[in-house]
Design a protein with these regions (language model features):
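Juxtamembrane helix-loop-helix connectors linking adjacent transmembrane helices
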Residues: 78-98, 110-199, 217
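N-terminal, membrane-interfacial amphipathic/helix-forming hydrophobic leader that caps
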Residues: 1-123, 127-141, 273-281
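Transmembrane helix-loop-helix hairpins at the membrane interface
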Residues: 13, 26-40, 148-160, 164-281
Length: 281
């Protein structure tokens, strides 16, 4: 089982969609692409202002975060018992989140060192306009709208991607969701909490809160969102790569419009919950 692909286990509909019709996938993907301008227009009305944030940390801090993630991952490998309930899919969920904690430790240190606002620079700004409820409501609606508008494209690509991998002769890990029936009781509850709450918050804080501002500054808004989405998808392996890449683009767009991490984590967590619910049905 590919441990990296389990760090976003619920965002792997490709494994469940392998037997679905590529024709249906193409139709859904085409529908999703045709809806994109409408979705963009609606989201622009929700959040018309262009928000700019300047990150003072650099790529040396990113390298430090990667090294810290490697260390905490290896420590988890060595220290977590290789027996129930820490074996199997739960282990595959825990280890990547330990790596995320290591990376976020460096990200928090970098923000406190370089930014006047400290840790809030990672996508948790204070609301200075006074309209807290209105601002939060618009951000939540934007996240929900982006998720709903992106679902046809994501699901369509999920149907198509296994056929592409098969054509290329490349294998993908299909075990992330299919191994979940092995979990019962507290292990199953822990796995759901990790997948729907913990992983979205940690991963969005690192990828969209820490990496994306730096990449946007150096490679433009479009280039930065694309590159971070590629990195985001690459850690999950070939099996779910393209669907997760599309999800990463959606989450990057949410962060770009709101400059907040919690709407990204909201969309991420809801999507994970949706896919898990469908897989369990």
């Amino acid at each position: 089982m590919n441990v990296a692909s389990i760090s976003l286990a619920p965002l792997e509909p490709a494994a469940q969609a392998a037997a679905a019709s590529p024709t249906m996938g193409a139709a859904l993907a085409a529908l999703g692409l045709s809806l994109a301008p409408l979705v963009q227009a609606v989201l622009f009305r929700l959040q018309p202002r262009r928000r700019v944030f300047f990150a003072r940390w650099g790529f040396s801090h990113v390298l430090g975060a990667v090294l810290a993630a490697s260390v905490t991952y290896l420590l988890g490998e060595a220290l977590l018992p290789d027996s129930a309930p820490f074996d199997g899919p739960l282990r595959g969920l825990l280890l990547p989140q330990l790596a995320m904690l290591g990376a976020l430790g460096v990200a928090l240190w970098s923000a406190r060192l370089k930014q006047p606002e400290g840790w809030r620079a990672l996508g948790f700004p204070k609301n200075t306009r006074g309209d807290h409820a209105g601002e939060n409501g618009r951000s939540a609606l934007l996240a929900l709208g982006a998720l709903a508008g992106s679902l046809p494209l994501i699901v369509g690509v999920s149907f198509l991607w296994p056929a592409v991998l098969e054509f290329l002769g490349a294998g993908g890990d299909a075990g992330a969701i299919t191994a979940w029936p092995e979990l019962t009781g507290s292990a199953l509850v822990t796995a759901y909490v990790l997948a729907v709450v913990v992983a979205p918050l940690l991963e969005e804080t690192f990828f969209r809160g820490f990496l994306q501002p730096l990449f946007v500054q150096n490679f433009s808004e479009v280039g930065g969102v694309l590159l971070v989405a590629l990195l985001f998808a690459s850690i999950h392996g070939a099996g779910p790569f393209l669907p997760v890449f599309i999800v990463g683009l959606m989450l990057g767009a949410i962060k770009l419009k709101t400059q907040r991490v919690w709407p990204c984590a909201l969309a991420h967590g809801l999507y994970n919950a949706l896919v898990l619910g469908l897989a369990s049905a």
